[in-house]
């Protein structure tokens, strides 16, 4: 099996890192060889696999050593649960420099040091927020990741971010091989959430590859710096991540998405009763103005 490179995008705080780590733990359980590359200055993309607060990042260690050329692969590549290989790109101090540059530096370093040659089945890039510009787009722009999965929910801004990410995918898909693999709905228990995300995926020309229900066992596992797969393998939530993993292994529906307009997104929310036309009449009105009206 050829190595598959997948990037996980989505709105900040939507649960990308948690979803990614539980997903790769399930893939490891299936006997897959996996590497996670954290592309976020917070360096929290591998903590549940390594049981650590935060992994030392390539950018931190390069600063200490002098340059990235002074690093060895074993300095930055750690192995955790299920023999999952873990790397964090890191970034500059807050307010200084471009964090996206860290992603570029990290991926180039990993390639030069042969990190991708270890008979891997999957590489997952866990990418900061919904930023698809500059360095954070590198997994897409440089054809590193061929499959993009977008984590979202039935909340308007999560859907808005997913649509924006699809616009970024289109930009690079036309000149490369990157494709959208599907939407992963990380439930926030909003009304008709699964139907809504399936409808959004359909409009984007894609699929909701899996609906991950909300369950407090995820938080209980996170407090222990563990995935649900490791913390409570018999939990129903662990089976949800296993199902997601199997669907990604078997996924053949890789598309160039068809992003929609803001008007179309609002129309979709109205169709599902999340917004109604009355909402449009109150846009820009203060509480006092609404009382007068």
Swiss-Prot record:
Its EC number is 1.18.6.1. Coiled coil: none annotated. It comes from the Bacteria. This is Nitrogenase iron protein. Homodimer. Transmembrane segments: none annotated. [4Fe-4S] cluster binds at residues 98, 133. InterPro entries: NifH/chlL_CS, NifH/frxC, Nitrogenase_Fe_NifH, P-loop_NTPase. Keywords: 4Fe-4S, ADP-ribosylation, ATP-binding, Iron, Iron-sulfur, Metal-binding, Nitrogen fixation, Nucleotide-binding, Oxidoreductase. One of its GO terms (molecular function) is metal ion binding. ATP binds at residues 10-17.
């Amino acid at each position: 099996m050829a190595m598959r490179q997948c990037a996980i995008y989505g709105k900040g705080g939507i649960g990308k890192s948690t979803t990614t780590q539980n997903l790769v733990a399930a893939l490891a359980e299936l006997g897959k060889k996996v590497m996670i590359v954290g592309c976020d200055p917070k360096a929290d993309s591998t903590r549940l696999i390594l049981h650590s607060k935060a992994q030392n990042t390539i950018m931190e260690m390069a600063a200490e050593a002098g340059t990235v050329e002074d690093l060895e692969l074993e300095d930055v590549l750690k192995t955790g649960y299920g023999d999952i290989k873990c790397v964090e790109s890191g970034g500059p101090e807050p307010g200084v420099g471009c964090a996206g540059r860290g992603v570029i530096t990290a991926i180039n370093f990993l390639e030069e040091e042969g990190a991708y040659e270890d008979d891997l089945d999957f590489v997952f890039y866990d990418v900061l927020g919904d930023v698809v510009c500059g360095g954070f787009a590198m997994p897409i722009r440089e054809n590193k990741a061929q499959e993009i999965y977008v984590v979202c929910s039935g909340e308007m801004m999560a859907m808005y971010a997913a649509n924006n990410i699809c616009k970024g995918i289109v930009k690079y898909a036309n000149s490369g091989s990157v494709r959208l693999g599907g939407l992963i709905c990380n439930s926030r228990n909003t009304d008709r959430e699964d139907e809504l995300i399936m409808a959004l995926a359909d409009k984007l020309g894609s699929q909701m590859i899996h609906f991950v229900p909300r369950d407090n066992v995820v938080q209980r596992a996170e407090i222990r710096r563990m995935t649900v797969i490791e913390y409570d393998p018999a939990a129903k939530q662990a089976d949800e991540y296993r199902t997601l993993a199997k669907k990604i292994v078997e996924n053949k529906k890789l598309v160039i998405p068809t992003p929609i307009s803001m008007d179309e997104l609002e129309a979709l929310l109205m169709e599902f009763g999340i917004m109604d036309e009355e909402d449009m009449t109150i846009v820009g009105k203060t509480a006092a103005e609404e009382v007068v009206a």
